[in-house]
């Protein structure tokens, strides 16, 4: 259902507030350059530091600006199941086409707890939902066997696999078959995951190079493996640079260097350190992005 090059879009700020004008411009930049779907309020969108009102407003602005040209998949995860249900329902009411739900963080649920959490949200809200597994941030790993149990639910349509492990992604693919789609959650392994049967990527790099990320996915789907491999290797350095510090600090700096919005992030995130900003600037010049 949700396939291809999907951007986890940044949330631009200006003087501490959401910069709606720049957000709309970023949406246009994505659509003009071939992005297949947009995820507002994900990790890259700094969802954890948005108020409930801001969270709803960011989704609303993106839905309005997209105007049904591509799917909008709202980040609606929480470490409270009740809250995740409420946020997902709000996203549906605002016109989102789907929801991306990160595994509950900090409280470290068991696999049974994770299963019950996701099932409860999927039972409560009739909206296509993507599981989001990123144990490096959440402290819990949604194991392939649990994904397989969830894959039979009609409202669970995909998983964003951000373990960085090709083995785990492959195990999910082997256990789930075509019941759900597997999307790479790490730009640097998009091509290997697609080669194993994945359907695309939820990308950080697409914030600055949407055309190239989209072209990689399209080349693979067209059977042009040589071009897909070329783009995979070409994007590797810039994709790694997006994690020179904690996401989304580097990508916010990169988008700012391109003149598209402020690099402002919210505490407890801090601006990119000067030494890393110099490294990022040099890499972006190599790619002729600035």
UniProtKB/Swiss-Prot annotation:
EC number: 4.3.3.7
GO biological process: one example: lysine biosynthetic process via diaminopimelate
Name of the protein in question: 4-hydroxy-tetrahydrodipicolinate synthase
MF-aspect GO terms: 4-hydroxy-tetrahydrodipicolinate synthase activity
Keywords, sorted A to Z: Amino-acid biosynthesis, Cytoplasm, Diaminopimelate biosynthesis, Lyase, Lysine biosynthesis, Schiff base
NCBIfam families: dapA
Gene3D superfamilies xref list: Aldolase class I
Natural source organism: Geobacter sp. (strain M21)
Pathway, per record: Amino-acid biosynthesis; L-lysine biosynthesis via DAP pathway; (S)-tetrahydrodipicolinate from L-aspartate: step 3/4
Site positions for Part of a proton relay during catalysis: 43, 106
Covalent S-S links between cysteines: none
């Amino acid at each position: 259902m949700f396939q291809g090059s999907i951007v986890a879009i940044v949330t631009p700020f200006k003087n501490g507030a959401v910069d709606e004008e720049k957000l709309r411009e970023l949406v246009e930049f994505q659509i003009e350059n071939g992005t297949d779907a947009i995820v507002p309020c994900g990790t890259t969108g700094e969802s954890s530091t948005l108020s409930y009102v801001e969270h709803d407003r960011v989704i609303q602005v993106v839905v309005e600006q997209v105007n049904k040209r591509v799917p909008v998949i709202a980040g609606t995860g929480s470490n409270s199941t009740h809250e995740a249900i409420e946020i997902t329902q709000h996203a549906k009411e605002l016109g989102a086409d789907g929801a991306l739900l990160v595994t509950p963080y900090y409280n470290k649920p068991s696999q049974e707890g994770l299963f019950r959490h996701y099932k409860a949200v999927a039972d409560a809200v009739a909206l296509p939902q993507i599981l989001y597994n990123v144990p490096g941030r959440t402290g819990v790993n949604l194991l392939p066997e649990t994904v397989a149990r969830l894959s039979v639910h009609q409202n669970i349509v995909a998983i964003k696999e951000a373990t960085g492990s090709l083995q785990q992604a492959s195990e999910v693919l082997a256990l789930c078959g075509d019941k759900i789609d597997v999307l790479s959650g790490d730009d640097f392994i998009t091509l290997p995951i697609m080669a194993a049967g994945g359907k695309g990527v939820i990308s950080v790099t697409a914030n600055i190079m949407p055309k190239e990320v989209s072209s990689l996915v399209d080349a693979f789907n067209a059977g042009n493996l040589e071009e897909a491999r070329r783009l995979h290797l070409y994007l590797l350095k810039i994709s790694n640079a997006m994690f020179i510090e904690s996401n989304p600090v580097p990508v916010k700096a990169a988008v700012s260097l391109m003149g598209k919005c402020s690099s402002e992030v919210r505490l407890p995130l801090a601006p990119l350190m000067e030494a890393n900003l110099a490294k990022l600037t040099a890499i972006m010049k190599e790619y002729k992005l600035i």
